[in-house]
Amino acid sequence: GLGGRLDATNSVAHPVLCIITSISLEHTEILGDTIAQIAGEKAGIIKTGVPVVFDANESEAAAVIADRARELHSPCTALEKKMYRMLEFKNNFIDFSLSTAYDKETRWTIPGAADYQVENAALAILAMRILQQQYPSAFSGDSFEQQLHSGMKAAFWPGRMQEIAPEIYFDGAHNTSGIGMFTEAVKRLT
């Protein structure tokens, strides 16, 4: 979908959490031709008082999203590049560390070879931590932690850096930024 205000998922009237992934130039004929305009459209999913977690690695987009969250009195948590780092890439798995208000330098493993997969996984983990704070009885205990770690390790993103045959990868990247990240990931494998 288009993401944001115009996305079909925005029909959920009372979400428990809003998540905005990285923003780059895409669908410019509909969303606008600047990062700020696109971020404004993406921020259209934010609902009054509903927590929002977002990728803040593009500063112009982050400012727009944070401003919109403030306008709507929505608690806002930003994922910044300094909060995670890739530790090791081995056998099509990435080990990375994540340091947030909820996780102090925890180690995670995900399948894949692309940096954007680390960003997306870190954002998903941060989102789960926020839900854990909101609903502690539903998301607590050692078994939850084990499930979260094993779920991340078993994650599969169809059409994103997907190996469709030995040493042949497919990625549905549809903008310049995504294609660049895919190219970097392929270089890492060769």
Question: Language-model segments: which ranges?
Answer:
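Short beta->alpha linker loops
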Residues: G1, A56-E60, F156, H174
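Short acidic loop-to-helix transition motifs that present clustered carboxylates
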Residues: L2-R5, M83-Y84
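Nucleotide phosphate-binding/pyrophosphate-handling subdomain across enzymes
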Residues: L6-I19, I23-S24, T28, Q37, ...
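Acidic, Mg2+-coordinating active-site environments of NTP-dependent enzymes
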Residues: P15, I19-W108, A121, I125-S143
